[in-house]
Design a protein with these regions (language model features):
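Hydrophobic alpha-helical membrane-insertion segments, chiefly the h-region
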Residues: 19-29
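Interaction/scaffold regions that mediate signaling and macromolecular assembly across diverse proteins
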Residues: 28-117, 121-289
Length: 289
């Protein structure tokens, strides 16, 4: 009887050990499987499966509707009209915000930069519309948290501000001074929002055009040969280090784009002219105002 009971106890012990082992193994696989699912959720982009519209066709349609020429070299934005196109803006915003960092990292440099410029400019419109009507973008926010520090959109899964795109990504990743004439600040003193969205295939040409257009607009930049002065936008003061990465002086960079003869005699003399920074007009670039 004792041997029988002993055998039963031994069998029960083996059964308990087996059940414990099975339970532990099951928990292990659940955790592993769960971890794999979490990894997939965090980065569900698979290389070679990029479905992003790099022509930005929806955004281009919006730009066609709201960007209005105000001078031969300048344009404004019809913010009231843009505000009315809520569904279009929601779709554009959703397309930009759903891009993951893994997907972004799989793109070419030109695709990345075109995306960031377009995202910055579109989100600038969104910021103005959120607070519209305003007299200036600088009226948005507080003394301590200005418009460019307002966290109001999602990028790569986190809530971001405009400064993150410009300083945390574009200026950090790309040594490209011409971006300062592609990024807009919703003000009359800043470069105009172009009628054509930025695309990878034409990016160099588009950046050149935007730079040349702004530098040749005498409302922002001009040469005073009589006074031997070169009047430049304050953009050149704020981002002087960026421009000097590829030029010996601010004069050299500016004159390269100010006209076909700016670096030829007698224009070449302007290389030695004193730089004077023009007043910056922070009034909203609204065609309604």
């Amino acid at each position: 009887m004792r041997s029988f009971l002993g055998g039963m106890r031994f069998s029960v012990l083996l059964l308990v050990i087996g059940l414990v082992s099975l339970t532990a193994l099951t928990i292990f696989w659940i955790r592993v499987d769960g971890a794999n699912k979490e990894d997939t959720a965090i980065s569900d982009f698979q290389p070679g499966q990029d479905d992003f519209d790099h022509t930005f066709s929806r955004y281009q349609m919006l730009v066609n509707t709201v960007v209005v020429p105000v001078s031969p070299l300048g344009a404004g934005v019809h913010y009231k009209r843009a505000k009315e196109l809520r569904k279009d803006r929601e779709e554009i915003r959703a397309n930009l915000e759903r891009v993951s960092r893994a997907q972004f990292d799989s793109w070419s440099n030109n695709q990345q930069l075109a995306f960031l410029i377009n995202a910055y400019n579109f989100m600038t419109i969104e910021l103005v519309i959120k607070h519209y009507p305003v007299r200036s973008i600088k009226d948005i926010g507080t003394f301590f948290v200005g418009p460019w520090k307002q966290k109001f959109f999602t990028l790569f899964g986190d809530v971001r501000d405009l400064d993150f795109i410009e300083h945390g990504l574009i200026r950090e990743m790309f040594l490209e001074p011409r971006i300062h004439f592609a990024l807009v600040c919703a003000s009359r003193g800043c470069p105009s929002l172009q009628k054509e969205v930025y695309v990878a295939e034409k990016l160099d040409e588009q950046l050149d055009f935007a730079t040349r257009q702004f530098l040749q607009d005498k409302a922002h930049n001009r040469i005073d040969h009589e006074g031997k002065k070169l009047f430049l936008s304050k953009i050149f003061s704020w981002y002087e280090d960026d421009f000097l990465l590829f030029s010996d002086s601010l004069q050299e960079f500016a004159l390269r784009y100010m006209g076909d003869n700016s670096l030829k005699s007698p224009g070449a003399a302007a290389l030695n002219y004193r730089v004077v920074y023009s007043d910056y007009d922070w009034a909203l670039n609204d065609v309604q105002q």
